[in-house]
Curated annotation (Swiss-Prot):
Belongs to the universal ribosomal protein uL16 family. This is Large ribosomal subunit protein uL16. It comes from the Bacteria. The keyword Aminoacyl-tRNA synthetase does not apply. NCBIfam families: rplP_bact. PROSITE patterns: RIBOSOMAL_L16_1, RIBOSOMAL_L16_2. CDD domains: Ribosomal_L16_L10e. Part of the 50S ribosomal subunit. Keywords: Ribonucleoprotein, Ribosomal protein, RNA-binding, rRNA-binding, tRNA-binding. It comes from Synechococcus sp. (strain CC9605). GO terms for molecular function: rRNA binding; structural constituent of ribosome; tRNA binding. Binds 23S rRNA and is also seen to make contacts with the A and possibly P site tRNAs.
């Protein structure tokens, strides 16, 4: 399971999840992706369960990229412990997810949209947040009006 090798501080405050994801909200590696629709915490166990579900479905067909990393420690107190005497010990690690964040990507020559959609659907069941399946061409259409693509170089003649 995923967890940081070492951290500067062992314990963190819980924090708030406000707004939408401004980073990690576009497809970077593959052709298909799973995008979060709401905010939440995803544990390292849930990430691993989703990864296993996808890899078992696609077998050796393509490549899967995990775009999130659980870097926030969640502490818990022992059961039946009285109040006080400090904060509990770190029990597990979570990734903080905001709406729009890309969770997983998938690509490869043998991966069709149908295979990718079914694999992502199996991964969706393992996650505690609502997600949607997106393709690279859909993303280009929505972002097409903002900036020209790299393949469409603008030439200026003088």
């Amino acid at each position: 399971m995923l967890s940081p090798k070492r951290v500067k501080f062992r314990k963190q405050q819980r924090g708030r999840m406000r707004g939408v994801a401004t980073r990690g909200n576009t497809i970077a590696f593959g052709q298909f992706a799973l995008q979060a629709q709401e905010c939440g915490w995803i544990t390292s166990r849930q990430i691993e369960a989703s990864r296993r579900a996808m890899t078992r479905y696609v077998k050796r067909g393509g490549k899967i990229w995990i775009r999130i990393f659980p870097d926030k420690p969640v502490t818990m107190r022992a059961a039946e412990t009285r109040m006080g005497s400090g904060k509990g010990n770190p029990e597990f690690w979570v990734a903080v997810i905001k709406p729009g964040r890309i969770l997983f990507e998938m690509g490869g020559d043998e991966i069709t949209p149908e295979i990718a959609k079914e694999a992502m659907r199996l991964a969706q069941y393992k996650l505690p947040v609502k997600t949607k399946f997106i393709q690279l061409d859909e993303q280009e259409k929505s972002a097409g009006a903002k900036a020209p693509a790299a393949s469409e170089a603008i030439t200026v003649e003088s």
